[in-house]
UniProtKB/Swiss-Prot annotation:
Residues 42-99 form a coiled coil. GO terms for biological process: tail-anchored membrane protein insertion into ER membrane. Interacts with get3. One of its GO terms (cellular component) is GET complex. The lineage of its organism: Eukaryota, Fungi, Dikarya, Ascomycota, Pezizomycotina. This is Protein get1. It comes from Aspergillus niger (strain ATCC MYA-4892 / CBS 513.88 / FGSC A1513).
């Protein structure tokens, strides 16, 4: 089984990734993946796309047909366009409703998988030390602070370890980003000199 130390660290990595990538981006990606699965929703999505293309084609045909010179043809196209547009709007309304409920489900699962899990671990393991410190290694007040609020004295509590993990992950991500940006600008500088 995964130790408490690594469990808390991985939960914070997941939280950081969700916050960095963006919840709406993840929701949209999962929605697109869900539409690839053969379900009734994916059939509706394919039908919606077909109707959308048909509406655009009918609109194009109507614009290319003179309403005065070829009124019968134009009126027939107009009726077909209106009927197809109604079908498209009905299916679109159903898909929007299903996407809204899908998004709520994804948000709930995401919260329970990240922040909810973090809160659960902090509550459930509040008296459990993440790891012990060597005795006499730190002054009493520092050892007390590291074991705050309920871990045994001389150990690191899950709350403190959770804060350390969150801070370390954020700091390391900023360092990696800065290094990558510095390399990108260093690589772009010689290319800019060559063009001048």
């Amino acid at each position: 089984m995964l130790s408490l130390l690594w469990s808390v660290f991985l939960v914070h990595v997941a939280i950081y990734l969700v916050n960095t990538i963006g919840a709406s981006t993840i929701d949209n990606l999962l929605w697109l993946l869900y539409l690839k699965v053969p379900t009734s929703t994916s059939k509706k999505y394919k039908e919606q796309n077909r109707l959308k293309r048909e509406v655009v084609q009918l609109k194009r045909d109507m614009n290319n047909t003179s309403s005065q010179d070829e009124f019968a043809k134009w009126a027939k196209l107009r009726r077909k366009h209106d009927k197809t547009m109604e079908e498209y709007e009905a299916i679109n309304k159903q898909l929007v409703s299903q996407k809204t409920s899908f998004d709520w489900g994804v948000k709930i699962v995401r919260w329970f998988g990240t922040s909810g899990l973090k809160f659960f671990l902090q509550f459930w393991y509040s008296k459990t030390p993440v790891f012990h410190l060597p005795e006499g290694w730190l002054p009493y007040y520092v050892a007390w602070l590291l074991s705050f609020p309920r871990a045994p004295m001389g150990s690191v509590s899950i709350q403190i370890w959770s804060n350390v993990c969150a801070t370390a992950i954020t700091t390391m991500a900023e360092v990696v980003t800065a290094v990558l940006l510095q390399r990108a600008t260093a690589a772009a500088a010689p290319a800019a000199k060559k063009t001048q």
